[in-house]
Amino acid sequence: MIYGIEAASFHVPSLYLEIKDLAEKRNIEPAKLEKGLGLHKMAFPDVHEDAATFAAEALLKLIRDYNLNPKEISRIYLGTESALDAAKPTATYAMQMVETVLEKDFGARCFKNCDVVDMTFACVG
């Protein structure tokens, strides 16, 4: 058995706001954000997106890009600043969404031997 991180993935929403526009609305000098922090645009979720759908998109991309078998994945770590539920890891929602998409290729409950961990903290997530 091989241990360690085999792959990582992320999802960036397609909607964004130019930092210059944000700075002007907030009465901040645009150069402070553009040159000082290196920011040029800020992505934000569409009405049907949240932390769980971002995670599901990233997980599905990871599985497809690395040709992974979900039945062989034993743990999924999710890093986020935005938990959906104080009792249930956001990664469980993502895993359930991806499991539904992968059911025809890998069978029902293809993640049944996988556990999930959320890391909800701005600097870690």
Language-model-detected regions and their locations in the chain:
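Conserved "HGTGT" condensation-loop signature of ketosynthase/thiolase-family condensing enzymes
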Residues: 1-77, 98-103
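Conserved catalytic cysteine-centered active-site region
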Residues: 31-50, 83-125
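Residues that line or immediately flank small-molecule/substrate-binding pockets and catalytic motifs
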Residues: 80
